[in-house]
Design a protein with these regions (language model features):
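PLP-dependent aminotransferase-like
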Residues: 155-210
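N-terminal "arm"/small-domain region of PLP-dependent enzymes with the aminotransferase-like
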Residues: 61-115, 202-203
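Phosphate-binding glycine-rich loop
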Residues: 121-162, 180
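Short, conserved active-site loop motifs that form the nucleotide-linked donor/cofactor pocket
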Residues: 139, 235, 262-263
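Short catalytic/metal-binding and nucleic-acid-binding patches
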Residues: 1-60
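Active-site phosphate-binding strand-loop segment of PLP-dependent enzymes
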Residues: 190-247
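Conserved core segment of the aminotransferase class I/II
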Residues: 259-290
Length: 290
């Protein structure tokens, strides 16, 4: 036990339901918390998960980090309450259980987990291709759509070829840019949060457009995105369609991959397909890009 102001982290006991951020409960009297076995005082570090490094330990270990890693701000997820029948809008998880047939298929695949998976993911790519109306050679699977985005940026961006994206959009784009030393061209959204896609015409930069955009939910017509693709013939346009299945029919830009060689459409199984925990994503493009 130390003197001074105490921060709080949970022990293995179950933390009671708290809707107010836990730092509001930090008290200048450590003895008050010391009498409650549900909590353990930690000095001088901030609230953290049990088993994580302390601030002092991280500072000591950071001498090994690259400058890029040392400069990164850690990702702070939203509060993850473990309650039944809870719809977690902050995580955008599907609240409904999978169909019985899906659960049975997953259970039936368990014995095969002792074997390495097919590196080409041929069966999965074939099934996705049928669903999207393309050929298996147009599909590349990844560990969630984030890996597909990472691979695309590594392939088509560098210190001399920036990534252009909206200022209010998926927050992982700038993180990837920082990790890969990619310059960022941030394009402001309009007052109503819409995208003026004419600002993306002729940029000669790699472009990523979340459609529908997150968190604004606004959908761009396929024709408007096609004009971005058409006016950037020497650059890759990535269309991130994580939420496309909620946008209605004929909203996807997948058909553009049959018409243009510079467009990549990224989708995920995490949202409408109810497989966030499986981490399965894929992208659609011409075979030469795949």
């Amino acid at each position: 036990m130390h003197s001074g102001s105490a921060d709080i982290t949970t022990t293995s006991s179950v933390l009671p339901m708290i809707t107010t951020p836990i730092w509001h409960y930090i008290d200048t009297n450590p003895a008050k918390w010391a009498q409650d076995t549900r909590y353990v005082t930690v000095f001088p570090d901030p609230v953290r998960r049990p088993g994580c490094c302390t601030t002092t330990e991280v500072t000591h270990m950071s001498r090994y980090f690259t400058k890029t890693l040392a400069a990164l701000e850690p990702y702070t997820p939203g509060e993850q309450l473990k309650l039944p029948d809870l719809v977690k809008l902050n995580a955008n998880e599907n609240p409904y259980p999978p169909a019985p047939g899906v659960a049975a298929a997953v259970a039936g695949a368990v014995p095969g987990l002792r074997l390495y998976s097919d590196l080409t993911e041929a069966a999965l790519c074939a099934a996705i291709a049928r669903h999207c109306g393309v050929q298996p050679e147009n599909i590349l699977c990844g560990n969630g759509s984030d890996e597909n985005l990472l691979l695309a940026l590594r392939a088509f961006c560098d210190e001399t070829h920036p990534l252009a994206f909206a200022d209010i959009t998926y927050s992982f784009y700038p993180v990837l840019c920082d990790l890969l030393h990619i310059p960022q061209h941030v394009i402001l959204v309009e007052e109503d949060f819409s995208l003026d896609l004419s600002k993306y015409h002729g940029l000669n930069e790699t472009i990523v457009i979340a459609n529908p955009n997150a968190p604004t939910t606004l959908l761009q017509p396929v024709a408007a995105i096609e004009e971005v693709v058409r006016t950037n013939p020497d650059s890759i346009v990535i269309v991130d369609e994580a939420y496309i299945d909620f946008a209605g029919p004929n909203a996807s830009c997948v058909p553009l991959t049959k018409k243009y060689d510079n467009v990549i459409v990224v989708q995920t199984f995490s949202k409408s397909h109810n497989l966030a925990g499986a981490r399965v994503g894929f992208c659609v493009a011409i075979p030469e890009l795949i």
